[in-house]
């Protein structure tokens, strides 16, 4: 299964600009960010952040609520998880910046320095192939094959296993 690091800068740009990658929440099908991202891409084009700011003296980081906060129900109780959906203008500028030829090459180079023969990194984003319907399903399939199945195989070889999990990282 192909990871995002195997993509060219052009394909990586397209990957990030897909609605399902802009917001990976399980939202109703009628909520699609494609038109928003296409609008922002057309409106901003090659302009810099400074060129599109309304108030040239203030950066987005100086404002509260520049992103869109949603509350997602965590379980059947009264626990909600705050999720920020990135401001589409800032998201576009970030995607455009990281997928320039030089920056994308550097990102891929740095990730190569993290490679270790005894550590498998499963969390790198996966790209859907012919079998998968979405990038998310590609990631789930990869998780199933490289974590769940590999755990079963390794359990035959090792006597003990250390497991950790974050159960509620958004507690109040």
Segments (PLM) and residue ranges:
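Conserved two-metal-ion catalytic palm core of "right-hand" nucleic acid polymerases
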Residues: 1-172
């Amino acid at each position: 299964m192909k990871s995002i690091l195997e993509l060219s800068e052009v394909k990586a740009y397209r990957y990030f600009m897909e609605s399902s990658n802009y917001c990976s929440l399980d939202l109703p099908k009628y909520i699609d960010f494609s038109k928003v991202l296409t609008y922002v891409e057309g409106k901003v084009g090659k302009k810099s952040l400074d060129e599109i700011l309304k108030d040239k003296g203030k950066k987005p980081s100086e404002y509260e609520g520049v992103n869109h906060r949603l509350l997602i129900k965590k379980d059947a109780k009264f626990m909600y998880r705050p999720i920020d959906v990135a401001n589409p203008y800032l998201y576009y500028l970030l995607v455009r910046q990281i997928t320039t030829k030089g920056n994308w090459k550097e990102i891929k180079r740095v990730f190569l320095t993290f490679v270790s023969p005894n550590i498998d990194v499963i969390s790198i984003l996966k790209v859907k192939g012919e079998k998968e319907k979405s990038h998310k399903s590609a990631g789930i399939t990869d998780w199933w094959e490289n974590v769940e199945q590999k755990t079963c195989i390794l359990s035959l070889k090792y006597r003990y296993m250390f497991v950790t999990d974050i159960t509620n990282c958004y507690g109040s």
